Every structure is written in structure tokens, then in C-alpha cells.
Amino acid sequence: KTADIFVELARRCDTTDKNSVEAIGLGAANQESVIWTAIHKELQPGPPSEWPESFARLTWRLWGAAPLDNLKARATDLSLSLDQRKFAVESIAFIDDARAARVMLELASEGSPVKGEATAWLLRNAAGEWAKYDLAKGLKNQGIYDPESIVISAAPVPEPPGPAPAVEKILKLKGDPSRGRTAAARCILCHQVGEQGN
């Protein structure tokens, strides 16, 4: 019933204003796919590689599963900039749907132009929003994460410093002004020593 309203909002939305985009997303809660499909049908943004940035931003915030195939196409399309492809991967990462998790696994496979970004999102979401989709097997099969292969190594604790020399000994030392000037030159890069430094 509200699809026509959202289409009009999408037409008028200044997508550079994150609050406007968020307002559409909040209003579309629990019906994101229906709203996205209506907006896509009416605005006709063209093939995924030709979407205007405004439509890509709306798609990012309408977290339904409907645009998954389009987002996957954008993520792997080398005619798009790296930032545009990464934004498509990020858009998939916010979709709470088992298909989104599977698409992300595909994007994290060998040869994918967004393998690194997809892998990072998988690791982030596998213990969070997507934990219920049991990604463990897919992560293990693709060599991304296998908890059984993790080796825990002890971090060596450094030896404690020896005792400091007595103050009397330090006071007996003769200073070397040229060496002191050199040492202070390193310090004044960040600190102020007398009239010099930052």
C-alpha cells in the first residue's frame, strides 16, 4: 500500500544526505524487498553497472534480499571503480538473509575482484548478524577461517630492566654538548625543548 509513497520519496530524496536515506530505510522496515522492488521498477536505473550513485545509496539502506543478484553483479563488474564495487559488497553485508551470506562466500572465493573486502565482511558477520546461517563450513572449505587450525603461541615477556645506577653516579657523568644537541634534535620533532620544537 505504501510502495507509491516510497517511490515518490526515492525520487525526491537527496541521497547525499544520510538522514534522508536513513528515513527511507526506517520507514521501509520489514518490507525492504517490496519497497526496493517497487522503487527499482519505477525509477528504472538500468543494469547494475549503470546505476546512478543515488540508486546505489538507496539500495545500500534498503536491506532486503531483492537486490542481491544486482549487488553481486556490481561487486564483480570491473568497469566500476573499486569504491563502487566495495560499496556493493558493503550493501550485501547489511542484508540479514541466508542468501546474502552465500553470495558473500562466493565473492570471497579465489579470483573474485573483491575477495579481500568480502572476506573481511564474512569474518565480521559470521559471529554477528549471520551467525545463524552457519557459515563455519563455508569459511573452512574456502580456507578463510578454520578454528581447528589455529595455533596459539605464547608471547614472550621481556626481561625486567636491571637496577638503575645510583643518582650520585649519574651526577658524576660529564656531558657532551654536541651529542646532547643531536639527541635533542630528535626530541624537538614532537616536543618543545627551550625555545625549539613543536
Describe the function of each predicted region:
Residues 12, 196-198:
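Gly/Gly-Pro-rich "capping" loops immediately C-terminal to redox-active cysteine motifs
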Residues 1-183:
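Long, ordered, helix-rich scaffold segments
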Residues 181-193:
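C-type cytochrome heme c attachment motif
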